[in-house]
């Protein structure tokens, strides 16, 4: 089993458990150059809020889009948008990525901005 398929396997297992709980989930995806985050409805069929380093408003603040500062900016923007829509509590789905570095920076920034998980 290679690294990618192991990550996808971990993500699938966690996603299944969160679906059983019926919780709104904060999903994170990380690529070498960008960070993406979405808040997905409990039924899994609707993206309620999204933010990424591809957005012009976030990119203008940053020098590089693939570091911890960029991840923190995405987390803060996502949390602000979620709170505007009345979403205060989510479950964190790290998509099989290790809770370290950019994933952790995004989560910490979202918590500081007011999201609970």
Swiss-Prot record:
Lineage: superkingdom: Bacteria
Keyword RNA-binding: yes
Keyword Transmembrane helix: no
GO molecular function: 5S rRNA binding; structural constituent of ribosome
Cross-referenced Gene3D superfamilies: 3.30.420.100
GO-annotated biological processes: translation
Coiled-coil blocks: none
Keywords: Ribonucleoprotein, Ribosomal protein, RNA-binding, rRNA-binding
GO cellular component: cytosolic large ribosomal subunit
Cross-referenced HAMAP family: Ribosomal_uL18_B
Summary of subunit composition and partner proteins: Part of the 50S ribosomal subunit; part of the 5S rRNA/L5/L18/L25 subcomplex. Contacts the 5S and 23S rRNAs.
UniProt similarity note: Belongs to the universal ribosomal protein uL18 family.
NCBIfam families given in the database record: L18_bact
Known function: This is one of the proteins that bind and probably mediate the attachment of the 5S RNA into the large ribosomal subunit, where it forms part of the central protuberance.
Record-given protein name: Large ribosomal subunit protein uL18
Organism: Buchnera aphidicola subsp. Acyrthosiphon kondoi
């Amino acid at each position: 089993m290679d690294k990618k398929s192991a990550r996808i396997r971990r993500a699938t297992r966690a996603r299944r458990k969160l679906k059983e709980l019926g919780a709104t989930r904060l999903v994170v995806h990380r690529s070498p150059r960008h960070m993406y985050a979405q808040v997905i409805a409990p039924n899994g069929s609707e993206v309620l809020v999204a933010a990424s380093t591809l957005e012009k408003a976030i990119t203008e603040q940053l020098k590089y889009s693939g570091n911890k500062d960029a991840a923190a900016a995405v987390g803060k923007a996502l949390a602000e948008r979620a709170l505007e829509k009345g979403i205060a509590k989510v479950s964190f789905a790290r998509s099989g990525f290790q809770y370290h570095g950019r994933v952790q920076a995004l989560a910490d920034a979202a918590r500081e901005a007011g999201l609970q998980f």
